Amino acid sequence: MTTTETGTRDPDALVRRAGKRADTRQDQHFLVDDRVLDRIPEYATDADIDLSHVLEIGAGPGALTDRLLATAERVTAVERDPDFAAHLREEFTEEVAADRLTIVEGDALEVDLPDFTASISNLPYGASSEIAFRLLPEQRPLLLMFQQEFAERMAADPATDDYGRLSVTAGHYADVEVVETVPPEAFDPQPRVTSALVRTMPRTPDYTVPSDDFFMDFLKAVFTQRRKTMRNAVRNTAHISGLGDPDAVVEAADEGLMSARAGKLTPADFATLATLAYEVGQPEA
């Protein structure tokens, strides 16, 4: 078995042993840069993240899996490609037998997830948003690879160009930080864009909302008209937010909030408006 200077499996050799190339049509881009792979677990240990049971989504040929096994007590790897799932079982036979590695073959958006303590994953770009927002409500630390543009929008502050629905939604569940940008050369095959590693740490918001589901629907609605004032955004998007009486919300809300645009409001501002909308806007049951 070919190993690196640190004693871990060589990523390129893992790809060769898997006997299958990445399918870019399925957004598969294998992380093969040893230096990046070695740093990823360090971002978890530096933050004192509990690594007793790590969930990895999109394990592919197993380069990150190998690094995680060197750090974590247990790893559950979710892989939807049956060929790569079979390769992982063969490559890590000893770890599977020792109950340190569990391979779950299936779609991460559909399978039952274990009771993990953290998720560390190089996500397929096409499903990264859906996977992230399946994981964030679990209130566990996450280290996830995204396209850089998506990552920067996740971590954006209010009133910045990148700030939007994604920023508010992610920040509702966690403190979000871009810890490293990763060039295309770190992957095989190389993607056309730069990637970024995001670390999220669960947080309790400093505001309350009537329900997470209603809050998310309200955000989705008003950010479809982010260039309009909130007055117009609330009125024009009742078909999305489910409000039966959006005019009642506009009349009851603070004028300063109603005259602002979505990109200028803080998460707490949105929570205030969502709570008011829930109370007076006659939302659908």
Swiss-Prot record:
UniProt keywords, alphabetically: Cytoplasm, Methyltransferase, RNA-binding, rRNA processing, S-adenosyl-L-methionine, Transferase
Any one GO molecular function term: RNA binding
InterPro entries: KsgA/Erm (IPR001737), rRNA_Ade_diMease-like_C (IPR023165), rRNA_Ade_Mease_Trfase_CS (IPR020596), rRNA_Ade_methylase_Trfase_N (IPR020598), rRNA_adenine_dimethylase (IPR011530), SAM-dependent_MTases_sf (IPR029063)
TM annotation in the entry: none
E.C. no: 2.1.1.-
Domain of life: Archaea
GO cellular component: cytoplasm
Top-tier EC class: transferase
Binding site for S-adenosyl-L-methionine: H29, L31, G58, E79, D107, N122
Localization of this protein: Cytoplasm
Main localization, broad class: cytoplasm
Role of this protein: Specifically dimethylates two adjacent adenosines in the loop of a conserved hairpin near the 3'-end of 16S rRNA in the 30S particle. May play a critical role in biogenesis of 30S subunits.
Family per similarity comment: Belongs to the class I-like SAM-binding methyltransferase superfamily. rRNA adenine N(6)-methyltransferase family. RsmA subfamily.
Official protein name in the record: Probable ribosomal RNA small subunit methyltransferase A
Organism: Haloarcula marismortui (strain ATCC 43049 / DSM 3752 / JCM 8966 / VKM B-1809) (Halobacterium marismortui)
Lineage: Archaea, Methanobacteriati, Methanobacteriota, Stenosarchaea group, Halobacteria
Name of the encoding gene: rsmA
